Amino acid sequence: ANAQNAEKEYLKKVLTNLEKIESATYYVTNESWQPGDSTALSTLHSFIKEYDNPMDSTIGASYVSLDANDTTKLEFCYDGNIRALPYHENKKLAIDDFTFRPLPFRLVSPPFFNHAKNIIRYALTTKDHIVTELKDEGDNYYFKLVIDENQQVEFFGKAYHMPLPPFDIGSTTSIYELWINKSNDLPYKKRREMSHDISVSTCSNLAINRHTIYDFNASDYFPKDYEIVKYSDLYKKKAEPTASSLIGKKAPGWILENIEAQPVSLADYKSKIILINFTGIGCGACQAAIPFLKQLKDSFTSEEFELIAIESWSRKVSAIRNYAKRKELNYTILNATNEVIKQYQTGGAAPYFFIVDQERIIRKVIRGYSNENTDKEIINAIKELL
């Protein structure tokens, strides 16, 4: 009981320190990991200007994320009313006011100190099923929060129990870890672990309370020569062809690398039917589809049917190799190129399933995955063509 009280008192002290932060500037390294991997899937270095924003009842903070190597280059901005997303390749800046496809929360990754503050506040006040641990590691304290609920818990400002998707996500346990520096009793590193995805953020060069929210104006960071567009227009204007417009057309040919970095061509495959699955490491629906796809591969002979996955998110051969090994894939997985994503018109979204007949005509296109429904749809389409 004494140890628990001491833990609680220390966390309250850290929370008080976090609540005193009106503004913070810092460099942050954000890593994305797959459970079981020994190397990060992606690593991003950013410079952050974070402001406490009591006027914003959703996230409770405003911030701008800039490229760590070029702090004039905007990566993301949120001011409590809008988020700004730059598309550097075509010099567009999308402004989202959250009225398009509204959700119960704002889909904004909270900045470091806002996130840490809400994690600790939740740990001290929640009635959810949680287990906490505080450990002295010399120069820092290590804090671990394990949330054992029927839904995963994410923080967009306060904690939200995430709606369960129409597929099995595995464990719904959520784990949050903080490393707290003893010199200032503030976190400098955090880790979030879900069944499908792990993210780690590490801060450096912290400066606190040099500015206030009144110094912050989002438009100061907008690139001057970019066209400003509404976020909703990026979706509404889709007069461009979509993947389903390929039905009845010849499947675009490709030569892509496998996990041994060897070239593989669509023309190499001689089976009657081919299922091409555009997938993404870190995509929950894609991972949920794997048991069915493995079973599907074993249900037909190689003369009848072939299954090829094309990894369109990570583009790192080592990550794809680890993924194939960890998931014990019994089918080929290839590394996508921008060209093949463009040809198949997926826009980088996943999962997509293209069912291709013996003449290599695309006969069916399915987007997304929902356990039994998608399984039946794919099996029926294959059997019809056989």
Whereabouts are the PLM-identified features?
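N-terminal leader/targeting segments and the immediate start of mature chains
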Residues: A3-D52, T126-T132
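Structural microenvironment flanking redox-active thiols in thiol-disulfide oxidoreductases
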Residues: Q287-K327, A336-Q343
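Extended beta-strand-rich segments in extracellular/periplasmic secretory proteins, especially
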Residues: F113-S183
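Thiol/disulfide oxidoreductase modules built on the thioredoxin-like
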Residues: K325-L329, N335-A381
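Non-transmembrane domains of secretory- and envelope-associated proteins
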Residues: F167-S174, S183-W254, E260-Q262, Y269
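An acidic-aromatic
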Residues: D52-F113, S199
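Conserved redox-active cysteine motifs that mediate thiol-disulfide chemistry
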Residues: K270, F278-Q295
